[in-house]
Swiss-Prot record:
GO terms for biological process: DNA integration. The lineage of its organism: Bacteria, Bacillati, Actinomycetota, Actinomycetes, Mycobacteriales. Residues 40-220 form the Integrase catalytic domain. It comes from Mycobacterium tuberculosis (strain ATCC 25618 / H37Rv). It comes from the Bacteria. This is Putative transposase Rv3428c. Keywords: Transposable element. It holds the Pfam family rve.
Amino acid sequence: MATIAQRLRDDHGVAASESSVRRWIATHFAEEVARERVTVPRGPVDAGSEAQIDYGRLGMWFDPATARRVAVWAFVMVLAFSRHLFVRPVIRMDQTAWCACHVAAFEFFDGVPARLVCDNLRTGVDKPDLYDPQINRSYAELASHYATLVDPARARKPKDKPRVERPMTYVRDSFWKGREFDSLAQMQQAAVTWSTEVAGLRYLRALEGAQPLRMFEAVEQQALIALPPRAFELTSWSIGTVGVDTHLKVGKALYSVPWRLIGQRLHARTAGDVVQIFAGNDVVATHVRRPSGRSTDFSHYPPEKIAFHMRTPTWCRHTAELVGPASQQVIAEFMRDNAIHHLRSAQGVLGLRDKHGCDRLEAACARAIEVGDPSYRTIKGILVAGTEHAANEPTTSSPASTAGGVPARP
């Protein structure tokens, strides 16, 4: 109406108020106005068949723990038959909070309704659609655990869940206004008490003067789905793209995946202390959860890319022991001081066995020790020249060539 009135003033010079425009439309388009206002009454709802869920803003709260003012929202679940409700104040509305509120509500009711009618929040619905909504994976996992159905309301249609929309003002006025809380936990416990002792005992005209709590106890409680024997483990899902370092970001941490998945978008499931990464329905990596930093499994890299990291000083000592005593002595010299700085040289010496064999490498190491220069370059030169069994000393590199190794110690 405001837009029409503004256009009349700007484009046609007609000084018409919004109320005048509204009366004119009601007079000349009475049938269209009446058609738009028609509502179809819902039939009766069976006990235990439906719960309606939504968030409503309560207000600002000073948190003594952080000395900051934060916004507080109320998670509200209303059983459509008895009108019995559950309220849980929260300061976060992420996936974990959304699912945790559902778990608390089911425990409060000691059962699960057959259908959950929720708003199209991203924590519950990834892609709203009238006929085939895409449910968030964490929420779908919760629904599967409790054997219930998620049935999102139509987008921008609050009348699809009037049982939870109407009590929001009542919750804010009766529970929240004029009260002070020392902690979020105290606030949540107070909300549970209020839901039972205040909201549950009010008389409702919609229930023909009955009280929601009494209606719930008498009829609806036994109609709810029983709670499963195993408690639900809170999970969160995220999606990201694998970087060229083979890591995927989950929260504030990075987790490695097999290198062949570089550039692909993968889903990550976080539950407790475990992070699982999925390609489709297959688990491709599992890590211990970290608050930040990197969690790297070197088996996710091509072998040639991780040789330095996999062939540790311990590996070098063990491999040299398998080759022979002379090789073991050479590697021990490398590892005696500043092992990490001489690791490349030790890896290089042991790598010569791939081309020349263990016997020749052992003989070359013995010859290098004999001439007093057991460096990588000298050992390689002996093998290339084929003089590891020569009676006379082979020609060795200049002293400067020992920079890549560690000379023998007296």
